[in-house]
Amino acid sequence: MAGKKVCIVGSGDWGSAIAKIVGGNAAQLAQFDPRVTMWVFEEDIGGKKLTEIINTHQENVKYLPGHKLPPNVVAVPDVVKAAADADILIFVVPHQFIGKICDEIKGHLKANAIGISLIKGVNEGPKGLKLISEVIGEHLGIPMSVLMGANIASEVADEKFCETTIGCKDQAQGQLLKQLMQTPNFRIVVTQEVNTVEICGALKDLVAVGAGFCDGIGFGDNTKAAVIRLGLMEMIAFAKLFCSGPVSPATFLESCGVADLITTCYGGRNRKVAEAFARTGKSIEQLEKEMLNGQKLQGPETARELHSILQHKGLVDWFPLFMAVYKVCYQGQPVGEFIRCLQNHPEHM
């Protein structure tokens, strides 16, 4: 029986780090076709196309320099050609671009294809919250799982030990995805609470922006610990309000929950850029260009989406930390006001 074909939709630092793992496993495991396609948004790097550089030198020199990709990972600039034959689609692009990508590949996929989203963020739907996996699943008519965890891309690429969480309602599919993605240094726990896993992944970036604000104005680890605790409480409250399925406290103790929150608040790009925002006064857009090679930051965008959702539901006052991040990012509120939000949080009244 032919092995299942895999396509990675996206090629930033996280997409490339996952390609390193998936390419290695697909080359060794009989249940997968060894050729893995990776859709790459074509860019010109020093007069050469990025796809040509990746396919010639097995390295994404722009987004994951210094790390060799397996030779069986093939960069493809056309997303339809990359995805057309895939049995398993791994989505790992900034969440604001997923609708356009789904429009392009809709109608070109295998009938029995399945997907897994590594995308962190939420959308606003007609009834409020719309998870990215739901957007993809409804657009493409395929079953969707999610992967979220304490996984800084550079450390995963360096093969430093970490854990992650797959949320998958179908047990057999969950085990297949685990086989595709697990290594001795990338250990996976599978749970059926898909929505909770995904909400954890989306909201932690927003909390990390708040942690970065604290760093930028010179507050210490005690303050950051308060941000993490209050942020986790708001994450749990949000999940209980908006998740259609069960929300168990145990899921927040998996890698997708408190572990991802901690690592992102200390080491992630959202924290780093938010710190620079607080220190320099430069715009988020300018800092994305300077610090992220133009890659998009998820935390501020998630704050904007949440503000719209919560305002529509009349629940803005229920999530003061989330909304304080929004006000600093989008309404020009001074960063110091974020500290006043912590001081006056309902938890302390």
Swiss-Prot record:
Binding site for substrate: 120, 269-270
Keyword Transcription regulation: no
Presence of keyword Plastid: no
Residue positions binding NAD(+): 10-15, 120, 153, 269, 296, 298
Active site per the UniProt annotation: 204 (proton acceptor)
EC number(s) on file: 1.1.1.8
Compartmental location: Cytoplasm
A Pfam family this chain is assigned to: NAD_Gly3P_dh_C
Highest taxon listed in the record's lineage: Eukaryota
Residues bearing the modification N6-succinyllysine: 289
Listed InterPro entries: 6-PGluconate_DH-like_C_sf, 6PGD_dom2, G3P_DH_NAD-dep, G3P_DH_NAD-dep_C, G3P_DH_NAD-dep_euk, G3P_DH_NAD-dep_N, NAD(P)-bd_dom_sf
Gene Ontology terms: biological process: carbohydrate metabolic process; glycerol-3-phosphate catabolic process
Phosphoserine, modified sites: 154
Top EC class of this enzyme: oxidoreductase
Gene3D superfamilies (UniProt xref): N-(1-d-carboxylethyl)-l-norvaline Dehydrogenase, domain 2, NAD(P)-binding Rossmann-like Domain
Coiled coil: none
One GO CC term on file: cytosol
PANTHER family, per database record: GLYCEROL-3-PHOSPHATE DEHYDROGENASE, GLYCEROL-3-PHOSPHATE DEHYDROGENASE [NAD(+)], CYTOPLASMIC
NCBIfam families: glycerol3P_DH
Known function: Has glycerol-3-phosphate dehydrogenase activity.
Record family assignment: Belongs to the NAD-dependent glycerol-3-phosphate dehydrogenase family.
Subunit-level organization: Homodimer.
Protein name: Glycerol-3-phosphate dehydrogenase [NAD(+)], cytoplasmic
